[in-house]
Regions:
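Short small/polar-residue motifs
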Residues: 49-54, 94, 196-204
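Beta-propeller blade termini
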Residues: 35-44, 94-102, 150-155, 202-208
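Acidic/hydrophobic-patterned starts of short beta strands in beta-sheet-rich repeat architectures
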Residues: 46-56, 103-114, 211-219
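Blade-loop segments of beta-propeller domains
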Residues: 80-102
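Short, solvent-exposed coil/turn segments
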Residues: 67, 92, 231-233
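Acidic, small-residue rich beta-repeat scaffolds with periodic aromatic anchors
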Residues: 1-29, 115-253
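N-terminal post-signal-peptidase region of extra-cytosolic proteins
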Residues: 94-97, 110, 221
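Terminal domain-start segments
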Residues: 18-87, 184-190, 194
Length: 253
């Protein structure tokens, strides 16, 4: 009888272990697992002690290249207090974690980026009185917005909300514009298709003025709305001044 009870106990323990293992397995499948993407050590709160900045990403399987979400953790080098920040819009592959001074206060902001299809997603945040606050958010990722229209003689006319204008010469792709039926060989617009602009395809931090304060250099593509024919690149520079402000813009072939 004792032997029977012992065997029964082993069976019950085995069933419990299997149940727990399956529960854990199913939980991982449905919610994903969290992985450390990158870790940096630097002073982000001006106490002359190195703080630990960690970027975590959640994905379903270790071999997946696409992350479903990201979480930023900053651990105070003195108190070991942890502060967390999860930008809800951030997802994608090839994530990066960088530290740059965008505001000019000699302390770095935290910049995370990831590729999401043909666009780049970026979140920039800073530690402000023990709270991680975003300074570059979801709406900033749309890039420069302007009204675009085809003009005569293979050109694009662009207008910004503040009234400024942008003129784009498309002579370099005249054969494509005529073969797509957008222009006649003589340069007359045939009222077919319209130009549009993509979100950022690239957004990098760069100390353009070599003064230790970083700006954002963004690249967008002007394309035809219906046929997605690339027309030119739009390069923009954004400097922080109570928010990132457009300071320069030009187009390139």
């Amino acid at each position: 009888m004792k032997k029977f009870k012992f065997v029964l106990s082993l069976l019950l323990v085995g069933l419990i272990v299997i149940f727990v293992a399956n529960f854990i397995k199913n939980s991982k499948t449905s919610t994903g697992s969290t992985f450390l993407v990158k870790e940096l050590l630097t002073d982000v709160n001006n106490d002359n002690l190195a703080d630990k900045v960690e970027l975590y990403g959640r994905k379903n399987n270790v071999d997946d290249t696409e992350y479903l979400s990201f979480e930023l953790t900053v651990t105070d080098g003195d108190t070991q207090m942890k502060r967390k920040f999860s930008p809800s819009f951030m997802k994608g592959s090839n994530p990066t974690l960088e530290l740059h001074d965008f505001t000019g206060d000699k302390l770095p902001e935290i910049m995370i980026s990831a590729e999401d299809g043909n666009k780049i997603l970026t979140s920039i945040a800073r530690l402000d009185q023990d709270i991680i606050k975003p300074v570059f958010q979801e709406e900033n990722n749309e890039g420069v917005r302007l009204n675009l229209s085809f003009g005569s003689n293979f050109s694009i006319n662009g207008s910004f909300a503040d009234g400024k204008k942008l003129a784009v010469n498309l002579e370099h792709i005249k054969p494509a514009l005529t073969s797509y039926g957008i222009y006649t060989p003589e340069g007359t617009y045939k009222e077919k298709d319209t130009p549009s602009i993509t979100p950022y395809t690239s957004l990098i931090a760069m100390d353009i003025e070599n003064d230790g304060v970083f700006e954002l250099l963004g690249t967008q593509v002007i394309i035809t709305k219906e046929s997605s024919l690339p027309l030119c690149n739009l390069i923009s520079v954004h400097k922080y001044n109570n928010g990132f402000k457009l300071t320069d813009i030009k187009y390139t072939r």
